Amino acid sequence: MNRLGTLSRVIARLAILCTLIAVIGCAVDQQIQTLRPGVLTVAVTSGAPTNQYDPQLWIRQYVEQFAAEYELTISWVVVPFNESWLLASRDEVDLVATNVANFPDRAHSGATFSAPFLYERRALRINPEDQERYEHISDFIGKTVGVVSGMAAERDVNRRAPDGVIVRTTDTFAQLYAEFDVGQLDAIAEAEYYALDGQVIPSHGSEVILIDHHDLTPGQREESVFVVCDKSQNLLSAVNAFIARTRFPL
C-alpha cells in the first residue's frame, strides 16, 4: 500500500510538472515579437497631439496603455494619412494607428486589420453663424468644401457633391483647419465619432457645428481599426484581446 501511495504521489507530481511546463511553453509562444525586439513601432499622423478633441490623442493614449501592459517601448513614426495603411504590409511599422477605416481596398498581404475600436459617421463642419444657411451638401453649390486626401471624407464628398460644389483637397487636417479659420473654406468634410456601444465621443466644443450626418455606406458602420504587421508575431491577437477588454477611448 505504501509503495502504491508513493507511486501515486510521484505520478501526480509529474502530471503537475508537465502541466506547468506546457503552460510556460504556451506563455513563451504567445510573447509579442515586434520588428525590433521590445520596441513597438507605430505610425501616426500627429507627433504630439494635445487637444482633448483630437482623435489622434485618444488613439495615442490607447496605444500607450496597450504598450504599457505588454512592457513594450513605443517608437512613433509621423506619416501622412494617405496610404499609411500600407506601411505595416511593407514591414516598416508594427502598427498603423492613423485611424484607418477597414475598407476592402485598404487590405494588403503582409498585414491584417485588427478588430474595430470605434466607428464614424460622415458630417460637414461649418461656422456657427452659417447654421441657418446650410443643411445638406447640396447647399454648397458655388462654395468650397475641404477634404483630406485619401480619407473616407474625400470618397464621400466626391460621391455625394453635386456639380458646382468646389472640393479643396489637402494632405492634413491641420492645413484644412487653418484655411477654414481664415475663411478660405465654407465647410470641412469630417466625421462624428462613436464608441462601439453607440455613444458619441465628443470631438468638438460648442464653437463647432456639424451638419448632414450620414453613413458613408447607408445602414453600415464605418469602423476604424489598427493595421498590424503580420511579421510582428502574436501582436494581432494581443491587440484584439486588448480591444475586447479596454473601452475606447480611455
Where are these regions (language model features)?
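A ligand-binding cleft/hinge motif common to bilobed small-molecule-binding domains
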Residues: 86, 99-108, 156-159, 186-220
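Extracytoplasmic small-molecule ligand-binding "clamshell" domains
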Residues: 30-100, 107, 167-170
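Short, hydrophobic alpha-helical packing/hinge segments within bilobed ligand-binding/sensory domains
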Residues: 83-88, 175-179, 185, 195
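Flexible hinge/capping segments at coil-to-helix
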Residues: 126-145
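Periplasmic-binding protein-like
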Residues: 45-46, 118-126, 200-244
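Ligand-binding cleft/hinge of the Venus flytrap
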Residues: 60-72, 114, 137-139, 150-172, ...
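C-terminal motif of bacterial Sec signal peptides marking the signal peptidase cleavage site
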Residues: 24-25
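Hydrophobic residues within well-ordered alpha-helices
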Residues: 66, 88-89, 140, 179-181, ...
